[in-house]
Design a protein with these regions (language model features):
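Ubiquitin system architectures
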Residues: 2-149
Length: 149
């Protein structure tokens, strides 16, 4: 009888660095909200939430880098212990609705597992929106959905 082995292989996408001198940046439309994500219904019928932040960046931008850019324009988010819960809002062409997918969490003043995740690794596509739930340090950190492993 032969022995059979089973191996679980986690596929990690290659980080493709972008030559930022030669590559045109994309317009990242970011919507921040305190304590919660915006409702997906706020993105329907050509509408978007009113508090838009426009950032020109590249697909290799990390969540840590995006956190820094949001902190630069929003002084309230600079306090140590502030959580940034990132989600991509993207169109679902099958049912003509938008869907939201959480992609990571960063925290001001703390290193985290998602800090170096890039937009490309999060499968961000040009035209998607970025929705950020900002949780101040005096509140509980955002609850993470269980990852389907």
């Amino acid at each position: 009888m032969s022995n059979m082995e089973s191996m679980i292989v986690e596929e990690k996408s290659q980080i493709k660095l972008v030559d930022r001198e030669k590559t045109c940046p994309l317009l990242l439309r970011v919507f921040c909200s305190t304590g919660r994500h915006h409702s997906v219904s706020e993105y329907m019928y050509g509408n978007v939430p009113s508090n838009e932040l426009q950032i020109y960046t590249w697909q290799d931008a990390t969540l840590h880098e995006l956190t820094s850019l949001v902190r630069d324009v929003n002084p309230d988010t600079r306090k140590k212990g502030t959580y940034f819960d990132f989600a991509v809002v993207y169109p679902n062409f099958r049912n003509n609705h938008f869907q939201m997918r959480e992609i990571g969490v960063t925290c001001t003043g703390q290193k985290g597992a998602d800090d170096n995740k890039t937009l490309s690794q999060a499968k961000f596509c040009v035209g998607d929106f970025l929705d950020i739930s900002i949780t101040p340090p005096n509140r509980l950190p955002p609850m993470r959905r269980q990852r389907p492993y």
